[in-house]
Amino acid sequence: MVREKVTVSTRTLQWKCVESRTDSKRLYYGRFILSPLMKGQADTIGIAMRRALLGEIEGTCITRVKFEKVPHEYSTITGIQESVHEIIMNLKEIVLRSNLYGTSEASVCVKGPGYVTAQDIILPPYVEIVDNTQHIASLTEPIDFCIGLQIERNRGYLIKTPQNFQDGSYPIDAVFMPVRNANHSIHSYGNGNEKQEILFLEIWTNGSLTPKEALHEASRNLIDLFIPFLHMEEDNLYLQDNQHTVPLSPFTFHDKLAKLIKNNKKIALKSIFIDQSELPSRIYNCLKMSNIYTLLDLLNNSQEDLMKIEHFRSEDIKQILGILEKYFVIDLAKNKF
């Protein structure tokens, strides 16, 4: 466990991690502060951040399992201690980490007797198991236990309609949220008009993200939600026939880039996040896993550096070079100087 003394700046707004610990492979804790804030700001930020942490961050879950020759969910299988329903509940608890977008397939094929755990799942290369010891089933006889799995990345909850499928597959209710809980509290200090606030934010995650990573992703999601309001043109705001509708001008990556470059190119590079570019989701996720969030981060890496990223291909480099050439008329160095 890491714990730091809380020191409050009287001028510059800053955030800091004051406590972090790993309670288990599937339970991480972090405590953060943001200060100094004016009266009322801490509650505004705390409420928005908590909602973003719990509802806006994506996670990866097993959403379907396929058995062979199983008539219904509450069946028992000879040689297996658990019922089909119990196996489904065990699969629901398995925590995964990935940069997957959409759905993918996985499988388990084990010969008994013995215990089947999460480490027996055969996964695609871009999906990892957080806790390999998670239990799936107990095989009491020398039987072959083979099941197919569907893995999906999403956010929030996914409640499947209970039904039996002809192919022997069963849906699994999924809780995609990597943040288990988030709380905020406020400490006020100072007197009269000089009164200020400190925001304390506590985050518990399931191990697929650290609390710091969750805080960063929630912040990015909130920024993306508000960006259109920052860049709408006043001459495009109007009311139609006294109706309360306000059409917003379309805001593109190129629009934001053009405005920023007029002022300062370095600021522009720091202000453009790669998830706002035209990069495919798979490339974006690979970059994000390597802590590359802005175009400035990207340009601080050479082509050689990017090729060291897991699952990165030469075709991905070509796509990145194409976007840099199109919008910046610059190239990415092949090697680190």
UniProtKB/Swiss-Prot annotation:
Q: Which NCBIfam families does this entry report, sorted A to Z?
A: rpoA (TIGR02027)
Entry's Gene Ontology molecular function annotations: DNA binding; DNA-directed RNA polymerase activity; protein dimerization activity
Per the record, what are the reactions this protein catalyses? RNA(n) + a ribonucleoside 5'-triphosphate = RNA(n+1) + diphosphate
S-S bonds:
none
Q: Which proteins does it associate with, and in what oligomeric form? A: In plastids the minimal PEP RNA polymerase catalytic core is composed of four subunits: alpha, beta, beta', and beta''. When a (nuclear-encoded) sigma factor is associated with the core the holoenzyme is formed, which can initiate transcription.
Q: What class of enzyme is it?
A: transferase
Region Alpha C-terminal domain (alpha-CTD): list its residue ranges.
264-337
* Entry keyword set: Chloroplast, DNA-directed RNA polymerase, Nucleotidyltransferase, Plastid, Transcription, Transferase
Q: Which Pfam families match?
A: RNA_pol_A_bac, RNA_pol_A_CTD, RNA_pol_L
**What does the sequence similarity comment in the record state about its family?**
Belongs to the RNA polymerase alpha chain family.
**Task performed by this protein:** DNA-dependent RNA polymerase catalyzes the transcription of DNA into RNA using the four ribonucleoside triphosphates as substrates.
Q: Where in the cell is it found?
A: Plastid, Chloroplast
Supply the EC number(s): 2.7.7.6
Q: What is known of its domains?
A: The N-terminal domain is essential for RNAP assembly and basal transcription, whereas the C-terminal domain is involved in interaction with transcriptional regulators and with upstream promoter elements.
Q: What is this protein called?
A: DNA-directed RNA polymerase subunit alpha
Classification via InterPro entries: DNA-dir_RNA_pol_insert (IPR011262), DNA-dir_RNA_pol_RpoA/D/Rpb3 (IPR011263), DNA-dir_RpoA (IPR011773), RBP11-like (IPR036603), RNAP_asu_C (IPR011260), RNApol_insert_sf (IPR036643)
The biological processes this protein is annotated with in GO are: DNA-templated transcription
Segment Alpha N-terminal domain (alpha-NTD): which positions?
A: 1-233
**A GO CC annotation given for this chain:** mitochondrion
